[in-house]
UniProtKB/Swiss-Prot annotation:
Name used for this protein in its record: Probable 2-methylisocitrate lyase 2
Cofactor: Mg(2+)
Record's keyword annotation contains ATP-binding: no
Protein encoded by which gene: prpB2
Entry's family note: Belongs to the isocitrate lyase/PEP mutase superfamily. Methylisocitrate lyase family.
């Protein structure tokens, strides 16, 4: 479990854990955290990793996912999330916030944030949501330079660099596969196959590419929602649920606000709320209180560390 003010597991160890999860026969499941507290809940629920979605970072700022967020904003939220969990954190780094030199700087900043890895995509800059029409991709040569620059800048060899290709919806799946092979040759540790349609598409990609693959199970998009077990059986190594928790939370928020606006009282929602005691458990309130009591009653003669 994380320390009070930072994870008890060093960043390099969490990066090793992510690589081990990608090499395991079981698929690594990584829900998207819309806040540090959500990341802690993900860990307690028994998942293998935490995902930081660019769309969620943007939505939290009431912005659309069209490349408006900055590296500073994404790195800040990533650092906040990585601080509170012992799980590996994978971050959506969009296009790397520019061209190859910017992609290199992105990796440096995210390493400093303590996350386990990031993915860079082959859309033009600024990008748009991968499940919207009208997106464009850069040439394979440009994306290869992005990946190579990121790999070259990486200081910790355990840090995972994933290449996302959006080409399936633009140029077709065969082109996306050829791009994925080129990205792997450039040093990518994993391929994120965005906006595939059916199990057959996932199977075709798995048969053609021999490095770890990541599936995106996002709602209301172009991809059929598939069980983690089916993806594991196909041979995928990781699956993300990028906006799932935010959509659940905001759906409940809007319903509750509507009811309170109409009735003037929240009693119908009390049984559906997270109880105060459960919130305190997630916040580790008692551990902070014990720490505070130790400091408050501190004396040099009687001091006995409790951690």
């Amino acid at each position: 479990m994380a320390g009070l003010f930072s994870s008890a597991v060093a960043p390099t160890e969490r990066r090793k854990a992510l690589r081990a999860a990608l090499a395991a026969p079981e698929i690594a499941r990584m829900p998207g955290a819309f806040s540090p507290l959500a990341a802690r809940a993900i860990q307690e629920a028994g998942f293998e990793g935490v995902y930081v979605s660019g769309a969620v970072v943007a939505a939290d700022l009431a912005l659309p996912d069209i490349g408006l967020t900055t590296l500073t904003e994404v790195a800040h939220r990533s650092r906040q999330i990585a601080r509170v969990t012992d799980l590996p954190v994978l971050v959506d780094a969009d296009t790397g916030f520019g061209e190859p030199m910017s992609a290199a700087r992105t990796v440096s900043e995210l390493e400093d944030a303590g996350v386990a890895g990031c993915h860079l995509e082959d859309q033009v800059n600024p990008k748009r949501c991968g499940h919207l029409d009208g997106k464009e991709v850069v040439g394979t040569d440009i994306m290869v330079r992005r990946i190579a620059a990121a790999v070259n800048e990486r200081r910790d060899e355990q840090f995972v660099i994933c290449a996302r290709t959006d080409a399936a919806g633009v140029e077709g799946i065969d082109s996306a596969i050829e791009r994925a092979k080129a990205y792997a040759d450039a040093g990518a540790d994993m391929i994120f196959t965005e906006a595939l349609y059916s199990p057959a598409d996932f199977e075709k990609f798995r048969a053609a590419v021999d490095i770890p693959l990541l599936a995106n199970m996002t709602e209301f998009g172009k991809t059929e929602l598939l069980p983690a077990q089916l993806l594991e059986d196909i041979g995928y190594n990781a699956v993300i649920y990028p906006v799932t928790l935010l959509r659940i939370a905001m759906g409940q928020v809007e319903q509750a606000l509507g009811d309170i606006a109409n009735t003037g009282i929240q009693t119908d929602w009390v049984d559906r709320m997270q109880h105060r005691s459960r919130l305190y458990e997630l916040l580790r309130y008692n551990e902070y209180n014990a720490f505070d009591q130790q400091v408050f009653t501190y004396s040099a003669d009687s001091y006995k560390p409790i951690f």
